[in-house]
């Protein structure tokens, strides 16, 4: 491992005694913030390039710094870099190593910069890269749901309210409901990215710097939309972390609801779908078990992400301007939320294309639950009955079905006419599952024709949003 001198703090000139050993460990963040090494180095290269442009560094000094930073990045990626708790964080570790490698020139890098604007820049760069990965995974899952919806556009299942059979719907329509939620999540993520893509670099500690820096130039080098307008806000703002975790919490809430349905549907009591074996596990004692661990775990992980949102809100509550050490606590919840969301989206993006559907079980479940009762009421309304009277008539017919163990479609015309003389032989056209779903043939409806049209619109949306 590459050694570096850690006997003196880079900020130690004002102090007369060494940091307490426990406090040194307690206040260090290098164990978790070193994942931002690439972004820290990228920000430093941009800063050094700008310092040379404005005449603070010579071109030779700039090149020394940039080459040294790239060598350090290679050391880190090769596992040859020794991280030190004594140096507190990713920034000081890299700067100390740079000075060790290139000498006094390395000490010039931090000119016109503070760790306050440095870390704010690093986090935004890191989050931006991760958001782009998450966006791609989100689009992949939406595409998988659209493919599944197209494949099962005419597969009939019971729709539920209160988890009780309500009306027949198509499986494709149900999948597109989840796709709509994820499309809203994507929109929130894109909005979040646009808002946080501003550069804090150059804000320094809190008030800006006395050097004639070019913040617009570093902003462009780093791919930001522009420099942050206010130096105080630039170094103290963590809205972007909160906003990301808000997006993540909503997304995970949606995935949790989706997971609950997958868990139910794989059970013997529903038997609507089958998950591939490679996404399930068995029991250590019960040989017959095939457990839907992936959706169960994703359902459980939603809570930790919501917890991270609350943690960040409470972290920032009551903080005065500008930077406070409290803000070191922003990274672990943010990083874990990022990791959790990426993992969950990848798992479902891989799994959903391989889900198989048990059409017979779904249709039978829809038939058992009197799911066409509303269709019979609508039929009577079209015959001239007020809806409330039709509702009463059908309720009595359902009661007979419950007591006799039959669906409405299994009753004879004579039996049905005992409840209303307006019922005629054409009633059986509306009492079939197919007739029920096909009748809802409008935008947003469950008819197979509408499902296929919605799939086309979803794919057009995907095409428009392949790049944020």
Swiss-Prot record:
Q: Which gene encodes it?
A: argH
- Give one GO molecular function term: argininosuccinate lyase activity
Q: What is its EC number?
A: 4.3.2.1
Q: Which organism is it from?
A: Hahella chejuensis (strain KCTC 2396)
Localization in the cell: Cytoplasm
Q: What is this protein called?
A: Argininosuccinate lyase
Q: What class of enzyme is it?
A: lyase
Biological process annotations from GO = arginine biosynthetic process via ornithine; L-arginine biosynthetic process
Mention any one GO cellular component term assigned to this protein in its UniProt record.
Answer: cytosol
The record's family statement is: Belongs to the lyase 1 family. Argininosuccinate lyase subfamily.
Which SUPFAM superfamilies does the UniProt entry name for this protein? L-aspartase-like (SSF48557)
* Pfam families documented for this protein: ASL_C2, Lyase_1
């Amino acid at each position: 491992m590459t050694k570096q001198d850690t006997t003196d703090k880079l900020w130690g000139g004002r102090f007369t005694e060494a940091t307490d050993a426990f406090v040194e460990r307690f206040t260090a963040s290098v164990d978790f913030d070193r994942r931002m090494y690439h972004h820290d180095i990228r920000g430093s290269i941009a800063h050094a390039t700008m310092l040379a442009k404005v005449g603070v560094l010579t071109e030779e000094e700039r090149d020394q710094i940039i080459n040294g930073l790239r060598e350090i990045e290679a050391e880190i990626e090769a596992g040859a870099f020794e991280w030190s708790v004594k140096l507190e964080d990713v920034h000081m570790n890299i700067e100390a190593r740079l000075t060790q490698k290139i000498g006094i020139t390395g000490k010039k890098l931090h000119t016109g910069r503070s760790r306050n604007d440095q870390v704010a820049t690093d986090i935004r760069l890191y989050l931006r890269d991760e958001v782009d990965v998450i966006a791609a995974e989100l689009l992949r899952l939406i595409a998988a749901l659209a493919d599944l919806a197209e494949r099962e556009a005419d597969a009939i299942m019971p729709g539920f309210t209160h988890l009780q059979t309500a009306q027949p719907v198509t499986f494709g329509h149900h999948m597109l409901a989840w796709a709509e939620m994820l499309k809203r999540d994507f929109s929130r993520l894109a909005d979040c990215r646009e808002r946080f893509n501003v550069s804090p670099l150059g804000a320094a500690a809190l008030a800006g710097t006395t050097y004639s820096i070019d913040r617009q130039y570093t902003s462009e080098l780093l791919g930001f939309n522009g420099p942050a307008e206010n130096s105080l806000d630039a170094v103290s703002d963590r809205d972007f972390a909160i906003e990301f975790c808000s997006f993540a919490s909503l997304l995970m809430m949606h995935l949790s609801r989706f997971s609950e349905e997958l868990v139910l549907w794989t059970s013997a009591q529903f038997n609507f779908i089958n998950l591939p074996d490679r996404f399930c596990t068995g029991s250590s004692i019960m040989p017959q078990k095939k457990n839907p661990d992936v959706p169960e775990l994703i359902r459980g992980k939603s809570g930790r992400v919501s917890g991270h949102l609350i943690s960040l809100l409470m972290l920032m509550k009551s903080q005065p301007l500008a930077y406070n050490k409290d803000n070191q606590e922003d990274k672990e919840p943010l990083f874990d939320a990022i990791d959790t969301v990426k993992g969950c989206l990848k798992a479902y993006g891989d799994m959903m294309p391989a889900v198989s559907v048990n059409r017979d079980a779904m249709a039978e479940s829809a038939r058992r639950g009197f799911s066409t009762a509303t269709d019979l009421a609508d039929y009577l309304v079209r015959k001239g009955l007020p809806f409330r009277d039709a509702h009463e008539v059908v309720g009595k017919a359902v009661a007979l079905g419950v007591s006799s163990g039959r669906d409405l479609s299994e009753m004879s015309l004579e039996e049905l006419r005992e409840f209303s003389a307006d019922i005629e032989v054409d009633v059986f056209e509306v009492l079939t599952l197919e007739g029920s779903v096909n009748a809802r043939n409008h935008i947003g409806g469950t008819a197979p024709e509408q499902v296929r049209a919605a799939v086309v619109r979803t794919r057009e949306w995907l095409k428009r949003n392949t790049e944020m």
